[in-house]
Amino acid sequence: MCGDCVEKEYPNRGTTCLENGSFLLNFAGCAVCSKRDFMLITNRSLKEEDGEEIVTYDHLCKNCHHVVARHEYTFSIMDEFQEYTMLCLLCGKAEDTISILPDDPRQMTLLF
């Protein structure tokens, strides 16, 4: 992966977990051909392991096919929550947890 192609390595994206696409605002331009254009997504794979979905793919420069970053996105269900994570040199790191129940138990107030 190429740290010279990005503005910031692994930027913190909060809860924004991308299953596909590219975070072009963080793309400084290709360190090999010096062009700043759209990215190609290649080598996309989806694996399921122990109830967890793992999506991986490579971000490539559209012009010279230089590998800019490797993207990993995971999805799983733990108890009553959907959990998402993303880790990518270009797109950043993020995680999110969402309740699958109609009322999120984390946001319920205690009644005394």
Swiss-Prot record:
Binding-site residues for Zn(2+) 3, renumbered to this chain: 59, 71, 88, 91
Transmembrane segments: none
Lineage top rank: taxon: Eukaryota
List of residues binding Zn(2+) 2: 30, 33, 61, 64
Record keywords: Activator, Developmental protein, Metal-binding, Transcription, Transcription regulation, Zinc
Gene Ontology CC: nucleus
InterPro entries: Churchill_sf (IPR038543), Transcrpt_activator_Churchill (IPR009508)
Molecular function per GO: DNA binding; zinc ion binding
Residues that hold Zn(2+) 1 according to the record: 2, 5, 30, 66
GO biological process, one term: mesoderm development
Recorded family membership: Belongs to the Churchill family.
Free-text function comment from the UniProt entry: Transcriptional activator that mediates FGF signaling during neural development. Plays a role in the regulation of cell movement. Does not bind DNA by itself.
Name of the protein this chain belongs to: Protein Churchill
Organism: Mus musculus
